Swiss-Prot record:
GO terms for biological process: proton motive force-driven plasma membrane ATP synthesis. Belongs to the ATPase A chain family. GO terms for molecular function: proton-transporting ATP synthase activity, rotational mechanism. The lineage of its organism: Bacteria, Pseudomonadati, Pseudomonadota, Gammaproteobacteria, Pasteurellales. Keywords: ATP synthesis, Cell inner membrane, Cell membrane, CF(0), Hydrogen ion transport, Ion transport, Membrane, Transmembrane, Transmembrane helix, Transport. It holds the Pfam family ATP-synt_A. SUPFAM superfamilies: F1F0 ATP synthase subunit A. It is a multi-pass membrane protein. InterPro entries: ATP_syn_F0_a_bact/chloroplast (IPR045082), ATP_synth_F0_asu (IPR000568), ATP_synth_F0_asu_AS (IPR023011), F0_ATP_A_sf (IPR035908). F-type ATPases have 2 components, CF(1) - the catalytic core - and CF(0) - the membrane proton channel. CF(1) has five subunits: alpha(3), beta(3), gamma(1), delta(1), epsilon(1). CF(0) has three main subunits: a(1), b(2) and c(9-12). The alpha and beta chains form an alternating ring which encloses part of the gamma chain. CF(1) is attached to CF(0) by a central stalk formed by the gamma and epsilon chains, while a peripheral stalk is formed by the delta and b chains. This is ATP synthase subunit a.
Amino acid sequence: MAGQTTADYIGHHLSFLKTGDGFWNVHLDTLFFSLVAGATFLFFFSRVAKNATDGVPGKFQCFVEMIVEWVDGLVKDNFHGSREVVAPLALTVFCWVFVMNAIDLIPVDYPPQFAALLGIDYLRAVPTADISATLGMAICVFCLIIFYTIKSKGFSGFVKEYTLHPFNHWAFIPVNFVLEIVTLLAKPISLAFRLFGNMYAGELIFILIAVMYMADNFLLQALGLPLHLAWAIFHILVITLQAFIFMMLTIVYLSIAYNKADH
């Protein structure tokens, strides 16, 4: 943008539309685009469900059915309890994260430029490039881990799991508790930071490539387009892979919580 230094340009594109100060500020753009992504997924899948026929299905219906069967198969192979909750959860996680990730393919200048027309100073369009969004989803998974652990073993079994393992003696309860709590907390933290780190890096690379268009050197400007295209093609793989990893780890963590043997 005219009149901006490279640092200003990058800083502007990495700034959130937020309300409040400090720890309790809310990123309004993250909330908006995550809701839009969820609504988009629900709209298309609900339309397919309403228009589903027993005859020859359309191409999009085949595509949706293929995704549903694929996710259900993954849950069946990895989670050995009832799939009534976990299968829809896994499908929602994969599709929702995928759509949020896919927003990163929109040229980086378009969202802030559109926001400027509405009098909005800052706007970031990729919810999964915001640690608050990925951490929020990971905390939900964490709560489900606790729920399925208690459901499968009872509250007493849950307490034993975190106090009498790996050393089955009352004297080691403090040590066992620290070790198990660290292991437990590492799951949502790694889940959140893996998705956030990959999507933040992807967004930053798009921004750095866009900076090349602002360069005075014609060669750098000319290199911007092929680099942008190459990274966008590669990023499609990253987008899909990160959605798959988040879904699979969710399934695996819930499976471990549900099936872990009593100690």
